[in-house]
């Protein structure tokens, strides 16, 4: 994946003031600033808390994207809408808004990063009786660090206006609700990627367990199946791919899997692939086994059914012992 930053602009949305401080032009893009935005965009793209959203028919935001090709003016309009809503609902964290024009693998994208303020500390020096005295002072408007996390943001694919959205619920007029998707952007609110992945896994596990009752470690085997597909397909997996794999390895589970997917209220658009983050793929590639006294053993998922490597011994009292073979000390 190649991310190229073309331009970026920053607006100050401090709701302790009556109006936003809107920038009249884009910032000069140094290597440090480019690296900062690249990092946070890549981190958003890899997050499984992201929501895949589509514009509603009357989305003013999408209409603005289609007809306003002035980057600075477009960013100011987005900042204005966001500030007005934040100013009316002060439970929403104050922030700076970075709007970033970038390409991802050659396609045009627009990044909208709400950089919520963090408290931080720095040194300051004052003169006391003619001598310098160093101390620390709290800064209440620190932006997320380069290794930190952007808590709210949207990445818009300008070829079809689809959106990858990271949003949080805040107390709005007495109840917790989203505001970016519903008010600022007027986009659909889809389920996060990790919930979609969980729904696919659960459907596959149920289908296999019902038709292959004697098959051990079904959850681990399904996780490995999905992890392998994601690793081979640019961190994405589709329901159709999972079904094809089930049809090859567990043919009796394919049709029940279809039924579970159809009944799911999480998988609203089964034809769309689900993003699986590299961190989640790594977790799916092994299983942690814990004993009652706190010992933890991590076993690669692909070895769980290999009796040449590990063996699970079932005792009459219902307990299970783990025999690990070919140990090298």
Question: What do these predicted regions represent?
Answer:
Residues 244-329:
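C-terminal structured domains
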């Amino acid at each position: 994946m190649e991310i190229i930053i073309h331009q970026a602009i920053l607006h100050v949305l401090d709701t302790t003031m009556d109006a936003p401080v809107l920038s009249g032009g884009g910032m000069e893009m140094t290597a440090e600033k480019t690296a900062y935005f690249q990092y946070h965009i890549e981190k958003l793209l890899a997050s499984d808390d992201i929501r895949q959203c589509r514009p509603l028919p009357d989305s003013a935001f999408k209409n603005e994207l289609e007809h306003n090709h002035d980057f600075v003016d477009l960013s100011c309009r987005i900042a204005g809408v966001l500030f007005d809503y934040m100013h009316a609902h002060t439970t929403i964290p104050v922030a700076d808004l970075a709007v970033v024009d970038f390409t991802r693998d050659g396609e045009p994208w627009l990044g909208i990063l709400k950089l919520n303020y963090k408290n931080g500390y720095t040194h300051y020096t004052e003169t006391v009786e003619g001598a310098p005295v160093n101390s620390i002072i709290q800064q209440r408007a620190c932006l997320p660090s380069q290794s930190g996390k952007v808590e709210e943001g949207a990445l818009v694919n300008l070829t079809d206006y689809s959106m990858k959205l990271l949003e949080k619920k805040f107390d709005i007029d007495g109840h917790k609700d989203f505001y970016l998707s519903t008010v600022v952007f007027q986009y659909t609110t889809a389920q996060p990627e990790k919930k979609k992945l969980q729904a696919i896994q659960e459907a596959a596990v149920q289908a296999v367990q019902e038709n292959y009752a004697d098959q051990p470690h079904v959850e681990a085997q399904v996780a490995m199946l999905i992890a392998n597909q994601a690793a081979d397909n640019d961190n994405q997996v589709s329901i159709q791919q999972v079904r094809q794999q089930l049809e090859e390895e567990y043919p009796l589970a394919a049709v029940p899997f279809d039924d579970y997917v159809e009944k799911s209220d999480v998988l609203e658009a089964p034809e769309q692939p689900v993003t699986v983050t590299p961190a989640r793929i790594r977790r799916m590639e092994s299983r942690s086994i814990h004993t009652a006294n706190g010992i933890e053993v991590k076993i690669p998922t692909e070895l769980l059914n290999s009796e040449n490597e590990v063996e699970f011994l079932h005792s009459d009292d219902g307990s299970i012992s783990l025999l690990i073979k070919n140990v090298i000390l």
